[in-house]
Amino acid sequence: RVNSIVLKRCRKPANEDILVPGDTVCVIGTTSTRVPYEECDDMRVTPDEVKLLLAEGEKLAPCLNDTRILRAYAGVRPLVAAEGDTSGRNISRGIVLFDHEKRDGIKGFITITGGKLMTYRLMAEMATDLVCEKLHIDKKCETRETPLPGSGKGDVQEVAKNIWTKPSTAQKATAGRIGSFASKLKFDTEEEKSLVCECEEVPESEVVNAIEHLDVHNLVDLRRRTRVGMGTCQGELCACRAAGLLGKAHGCTQRAKQDLVQFMNERWKGMFPVAWGETMREAEFTSWIYSECLGIGDEAEDGTTPETPVFE
């Protein structure tokens, strides 16, 4: 993690203009490129985009030149374009709510789009209020007054004090992820106390809690709930442990193995554009563990290209 506060260029929206800290890492971005509709489900980061972000990012934080880069990722933003804008940079990041009955004469259909994660609760409120209005329900959305689950009992420091059986750094990490729910985790056995993900300090008890209570069905769900696989090793050491717990909970080890392969392929997809130095060594070690030690996936008969993970 390079910085503890947001570093932002005060200028009109452009490439590589913000460095944001989050959990144990920081994220630099963004670039903006128009892509064909048929490619939206398979976004790829290019080497040129990575070079551009790092070169410009060093102007915000010179230490980026010596900082280990874990991964790069790309996604599609559902923004509404203005007529005549070809760059995409002048597209509003604001929220757009369409009532298709008024707009297109289609009853029973609305669209909420635009915005970003920071505004999702406002988007939910706007959409809910419109739906209630159209269904003649005299009630307003309550999300602005309702704390998110786990967030209603003070700050992270206070919550962490209730997790007595963990090191202080791990207490803060767990409390930061699940808030006051952390006090409900069990640490009665050595297994419950053991770490599934050492990079992010995620204990087995937190993983089991997520599987049982947080609608976790696969490793991607678990990653989003607990940050398993998002640390330095990118799932190298923790993904198998987590897959084992999922297989045990769901009673299907074969599905857990398939889930593990898919999860590691997605981790590789993010590592490939930044595969140099320590990240390259980590990727090679991961490949060796999964292919040679665990026998998960074999190389193709015609050889494996750098763009294809050897454990696929």
Where do the protein language model's features map onto the residues?
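Long, charge-rich, low-complexity alpha-helical segments
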Residues: 62, 235, 239-265
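Low-complexity, small/polar and acidic-rich linker and loop segments
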Residues: 251-312
